[in-house]
Every structure is written in C-alpha cells, then in structure tokens.
Amino acid sequence: MAKKINPIKFSEDESAHDSIIEWWYFNGNLRDEEGNRYSFMNCLFKADVKKVKIPFLSRAPFKNIYFFHSILSDIKKKKFYPVVDYISVVSRDSFKKPLLFINHTSPILVKGYLNRSLEETEKFSYRLKDDNLDLKMVSTKRPLLEGGEGHIEVCGRGSHYYSLTNLKTEGEIKIGNKIIKVTGKSWMDHQWADVSYSKDKWSWFSIQLDSGVELMCCEYSDGKSKSYLSDIVYSDGRQESLKGLELIPGKNIWESKKTKTKYPLAWEIKLKEKKISLKVSALIKNQEIIFGSINYWEGPLEVAGVIDGRKVVGAGFMELVGYNSDYGNIDYIKNELERVAGYFLASPKRRLRRMFKRLR
C-alpha cells in the first residue's frame, strides 16, 4: 500500500519536522550601489544522527544535530568566502513562534560569539543573518510546490520540497572589515525527507530570468538509474511541472586542487516541450565546499538562451554533488577528520551548556 503523502501547509510546514534529514537553503545574486556583483549561499541542516548515517556524525551524543554551510562570493575579484560548521547549537526558542524562527551559533568560538538567525517577520518575508550578511527578503510569488504537490520522487526516494523562487532582497554584506549595501534577488528551498546519506550524485539548477520566469532543474542518479525533475514558475505566477529535461555538460571543466574532483562549469538546459534552450556558466571557478568526507560545488551562474523563440537572459545557481573525488592529500583528510572529532571529544556537554546559556 502506497504511503499517504500529506499536503504541505503554510505556515506550519516552514518549521522543523520529525524527519531524518531537513534543510533551509537560500541563494542569491546581489549588486552594490556601484553595480559590482556578489552572490551568497546559506544553508542550515538538521539530521537524525543515528538514521542519517553520515559517517563522521554518527557518534554525536544527540538525537538531532544541526550543521551550517555558507558562501559569500565577490564576482569581480573572483573570490569566495566559505563557512562550514560541523555542528550548530540551536536556541530553545527556535521553532516556537507562529512563523519560522531559527536562532543558532557555532560552539567553537574562533572569532568570539556570533549569532546567526533566520526569522520570518511576516508571511513569506524573511530576515537572514550570518557571519557575512544581513539581508531582508520578500517573496513576490506564492511558494512553488515542487513536483506539482510539494513532494518529489527520485530513484525511489521521496521528499517534501517547496521553493520561493523570487525573493526581492536588500541589506548588507561584509567582506573583511568592509560593510557593503546590496540589493538583488534570492531563492529559497525547504526540503525534508526520511532518507539516509548515500553517495548519490546530482546536478541541480535554480534559474531566475529577467523576463520574470523561474526554473528548477535537477538530474539525480543513484548509480543504477536517473531521475529528472523540472518545475517552472511563469511571470504571472502560474506553476507547471515539466517533462523531457535534458542537462548537457559542456567542456568547461574545473578540477579541485584539494579533492581532484572535476566539476563541469558550463551546461545546456533543454526542455523541448516548452521550446526552452538555456546555456548556463559559472561566474567563479572555485566554489567547492568540503564537509568532512563530502565535497560539492555550489555557486552563481550567468544564463542566456531562448524560450519559444524569444531570447532570454538571467542569473542562477548550480549545485554539483557526488562527483567522483580522488583525494591526493591524505594529510588534508586527516586534519579535517581530526577537526570534526574535536567537536565531540573536547568536553561536549560543558561546551554545549555554555552555548545554551548564551542563546537563552
């Protein structure tokens, strides 16, 4: 008998769920007052420690663990500033308000106490704060229920999934000691599922066209089969799940010096049914995130192409996960694993009590 799929309800389902894995993800393309370009990614993960089966997290002394990844990129200077926290401490009042509210920090105080937060100030309006940004975002369209109903199936695995595809954004970013005012457009994903970690591979794209059209495209592979997903939001807000997606990697390949992973940084996206043909290319080559034994590429795109005979341009984001890695630096892996272990072996209870006091 097929498992009943509960429809997504707002605002209840913006909060946390009793699932194996869950994340609240944002990306965006921004400009300052001089027209200089920047991008960001911000993602807080929640995982059931025993069931998610991520190797280096399995010994953590909690039921659920939170961890945090973010990137701020300076497009002109071709530099990116990643932050990876293997564990985040969430405050007691998180998920306790009528609208989404998460307050968290790192238990490792390298640069002093720093508070990070995601707060829904009004329905589908958010304030996002982390190490390098303080942004206000307002959704101009209703949530995109991915897959048509907010539930997707990839290679036999089910997941609840919705997106806010057009978030009008303004605020500040911080590079070094410099505070920069910015405006732009952001994208939000919220996904939760009862699936364990696996070495599956996926190539994911969020596209925001200047014409007001947004597009999500994904190819997912478990090594035996592939699943393709594509959803579109039209300029008038209509939504549609599309079939026949083709994702064709180009010849622009970047090889990581750390992991030896080869990432294709240019792609062609085709949906013949809707006469969509888009070419996307990365704005910065090195956007690799390393999380223990897991590495992935995440970064901004420029987009150009044709929809139904009309030329279109825009911006986007790409995520490449599960691409073959051939670590050549054993010492680097050893240091990473030792750093992860340090989170849990150095008086974890005393350290966590101190963090909870700060977050009360």
Where in the sequence are the language-model features?
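Structured soluble/peripheral alpha/beta segments that form catalytic or ligand/cofactor-binding pockets
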Residues: M1-R360
